């Protein structure tokens, strides 16, 4: 088995880590972490389904990726909507999410098409989540009261989001070119996915700390 194949399989398996953590710590999860846990379950099932479909059928699975991008946008809009305190930020999250969904649907229908890899939609998702995660860190670090950020479950999940999407943004943008010339570069995605899933797992094992509106 090649290193790329091993990392691919381990990357997929690592997707069950946050799911198991959520089941183990479910009674301690607040609304935000439950939404995040639901997304991780969907993400794991999609990755698992894509892997087996490629192994057994070897058919074009890009339509699934297009719809998964849309699902990801909706989940993360919900997560960050509840994570932010200020009404203006909540409204901004919703507006940007709707714009991202409309662009992704337009791309799916008129630009790249449903049978091509969603580079544009994935790039939009990456930019959106990098902005959301940086804004959340800004809110977290500018609270007026003292908090242990390492005990905040969403801190770890947000760190995983920023880590994964900030590193992979250029990989998703250039996926079509890299697919034919530098397939080994995609191992970056496998490694970052494993690390992100570990961060998500840590976050879901945290007991939510009380948060005060500022």
Where are these regions (language model features)?
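Terminal, non-globular segments
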Residues: 1-214
